[in-house]
From Swiss-Prot:
The gene is cysS. It comes from Mycoplasma pneumoniae (strain ATCC 29342 / M129 / Subtype 1) (Mycoplasmoides pneumoniae). The lineage of its organism: Bacteria, Bacillati, Mycoplasmatota, Mycoplasmoidales, Mycoplasmoidaceae. The keyword Ligase applies. Zn(2+) binds at C31, C205, H230, E234. A motif ('HIGH' region) lies at residues 33-43. Monomer. This is Cysteine--tRNA ligase. One of its GO terms (biological process) is cysteinyl-tRNA aminoacylation. Its cofactor is Zn(2+). It comes from the Bacteria. Belongs to the class-I aminoacyl-tRNA synthetase family.
Length: 437
């Protein structure tokens, strides 16, 4: 029998090529939030997808370094802080605390976070390298821009001839040129060779990647809406400095839709993640995102949410009933999670959620059959596999088999064995209400 050697296969969302990750050190950068308000559900989809990616890579014995930026200086931050009559730092502190709290609620594994303002003092040096190599210029108004005309490869991510984009700036040589350092009188400012100001958004991420990985980034990810111009511009700066792409592979996450429209703050059709989690268990949100491949749009609807609620309840019931039968049968211990190859292989194949979920439902069906037949050996195998599969998807269930609940299960078992069926049925009803049967 051939030994299973787990390797992750990725379909690059820029090249559309399938690649196997052969190296064991995987460096990941995921574009993070601009912390001026709470995240909506669409913002959480990349977080959850990349959390599963990290879990799968670690299970496959890859060494993972996962970095995400937190943009804590921005025109929107300045505007909101002024409206609330607090400093930018106060607003960002509140929002960063809320963001990290949300990550815990979503059961996201630890990520190394880099706040932009902690590294701004080093960014002028990065920009100076671009100026020195002739890829940047200072405008008559004192702003420093990247000159896209100096880079023939510009537009490679968009995979098309890039035309103009809307921009209020009038001091650029080309409308596609993007700001590296802008002079400003608003908000917090930093000194640089080009005067007091702050860096542009695109250079912040490009610098943090350079600071963290130099030219050794394996996977760069974010929402598909960041592909152009944000990722295009990041890549342009890196190409200018290193004459090679910013990252080996790209992963772009599809839009979250609501009634066939992209969920966004600008359209005012969004639902805040924190509000969703006051109503629903975090597993329901994660399960929703597993219903479509990560690069496809997902159209959210009330019926889809209701179905996800039903699915999670069915899976949780299978787990709890299975655990109850181990207590009922006086087993010494509930089996520990054990790697389940069909789900593992599905997720190693570019996070094939559909295939993974198919195998999860097969396990649930087998568990229900084992319970009906009181097949303990089958229960042991199938529960250990189901627990592993749920954990790697970040939706494992904590045991509700407390000391009191165990005593109640044992009482039910004793009454049944002694033929006290009426009393046993009363206890059984209590177990059902508790979700133990």
């Amino acid at each position: 029998m051939n030994q299973f050697e787990p390797k992750f296969t990725l379909i690059d969302t820029v090249s559309n090529q399938s690649v196997v990750l052969e190296q064991k050190q995987i460096n990941i950068y995921l574009c993070g939030p601009t912390v001026y308000n709470d995240l909506h559900l669409g913002n959480t989809r990349p977080l959850i997808v990349f959390d599963v990616l990290q879990r799968v890579l670690q299970a496959a014995q890859y060494k993972v370094q996962f970095v995400q930026n937190i943009t804590d200086i921005d025109d929107k931050i300045i505007k909101i802080a002024q409206q609330q009559e607090i400093s930018e730092a106060q607003l960002c502190k509140q929002q960063i605390t809320a963001y990290k709290s949300l990550l815990k609620k979503l059961n996201i594994l630890p990520i190394k976070h880099l706040q932009v303002t902690d590294k701004i003092d080093k960014m002028p040096g990065y920009i100076a390298r671009l100026v020195k190599k002739g890829f940047a210029y200072v405008s008559p108004l004192g702003n420093t821009y990247f000159s896209v005309s100096q880079l023939p490869q510009y537009g490679i991510l968009a995979n098309r001839v890039v035309e103009t984009i809307e921009d209020e700036a009038t001091d650029k040589r080309n409308k596609l040129d993007f700001v590296l350092w802008k002079q400003t009188t608003a908000g917090v400012k930093w000194n640089s060779p080009w005067g007091w100001g702050r860096p542009g958004w695109h250079v912040e991420c490009a610098f943090l990647i350079d600071y963290s990985f130099k030219d050794q980034l394996t996977i760069h990810g974010g929402g598909v809406d960041l592909k152009f111009p944000h990722h295009e511009n990041e890549n342009a700066m890196h190409m200018a400095l290193y004459d090679k792409p910013l990252t080996q592979h790209w992963m772009h996450i599809g839009h979250l839709m609501f009634e066939n429209q992209k969920m966004s703050k600008s359209l005012q059709n969004f639902l805040l993640a924190v509000d969703f989690l006051t109503i629903h268990d975090f597993r329901i949100l994660r399960w929703l995102f597993y219903q479509k491949h990560y690069y496809h749009p997902l159209d959210l609807s009330q019926s889809l949410i209701e179905q996800a609620c039903s699915d999670i309840k069915r899976i949780q019931k299978a787990v709890n009933v299975c655990r109850t039968w181990f207590v009922y049968s006086e087993q010494s211990a509930i089996p520990a999670p054990k790697q389940f190859e069909p789900v593992f292989k599905a997720l190693l194949n570019n996070l094939n959620f559909a295939n993974a979920i198919t195998h999860i439902w097969k396990l649930v069906k087998q568990i229900n059959h084992d319970v009906s037949k009181q097949n303990l050996s089958g229960l042991k195998e199938h529960l250990s596999h189901l627990e592993w599969a749920l954990n790697i998807l970040g939706i494992g269930f904590k045991s509700i088999h407390t000391k009191l609940n165990v005593q109640l299960i044992k009482k039910w078992a004793s009454l049944r064995k002694n033929g006290q069926l009426d009393k046993a049925d009363e206890v059984r009803q209590k177990l059902i209400k508790k979700g133990l049967l």
